[in-house]
């Protein structure tokens, strides 16, 4: 019985690691056909924001220039001019299809992530007792570590998250989240988040050291500052 009770939190921990991927994959597959059918049959217009309009216009201009250059190399005749118009028409339709698929991708991924968040939130609430056990194990493990190891771990974690080289990692992570939710890549928003989020984390961390860690283990704070200097 004791082994079973000890194994249950470990199984719950493993499920927390692998369940999000499985839920995301399953929900995505279930919604894919429905979202595609709804968008293709229920939407009479294509909705584009300024960034998408600019991107589509740039692609169209680039395509037109390439086709025009190709026709300039050939002899000018009515047949070639007709073929040029047909080529522009076909490629324009192809660009619209690609844009339509991108919109379906955006709706699908956003809906999938919202549903996954709701399911995982409910799963966490139902497994609150197991989370308490895992938390007690983690606290016991950290308590048994020496102050030097704790200080080194804190220093390593802070350097990775809010160090001078961390903006590159934040840029990749935020860009990945943007892509996962199906949002259009926006350099201005990503740059703004990269420049502000680590600063906020750094402020919170310093406040945590001042209010909590300094009271809990003054020797750990001394070692941390010595290693940091």
Swiss-Prot record:
TM annotation in the entry: 7-27, 107-127, 189-209
GO BP annotation list: potassium ion transport
Reaction it catalyzes: K(+)(in) + H(+)(out) = K(+)(out) + H(+)(in)
Membrane topology annotation: Multi-pass membrane protein
Compartments reported by the entry: Plastid, Chloroplast inner membrane
InterPro entries registered for this protein in UniProt: CemA (IPR004282)
A molecular-function term among this protein's GO annotations: proton transmembrane transporter activity
Gene Ontology CC annotations of this record: chloroplast inner membrane
Pfam families, sorted: CemA
Sorted UniProt keywords: Antiport, Chloroplast, Hydrogen ion transport, Ion transport, Membrane, Plastid, Plastid inner membrane, Potassium, Potassium transport, Transmembrane, Transmembrane helix, Transport
Main function: Contributes to K(+)/H(+) antiport activity by supporting proton efflux to control proton extrusion and homeostasis in chloroplasts in a light-dependent manner to modulate photosynthesis. Prevents excessive induction of non-photochemical quenching (NPQ) under continuous-light conditions. Indirectly promotes efficient inorganic carbon uptake into chloroplasts.
The family this protein is said to belong to: Belongs to the CemA family.
Protein name (database record): Potassium/proton antiporter CemA
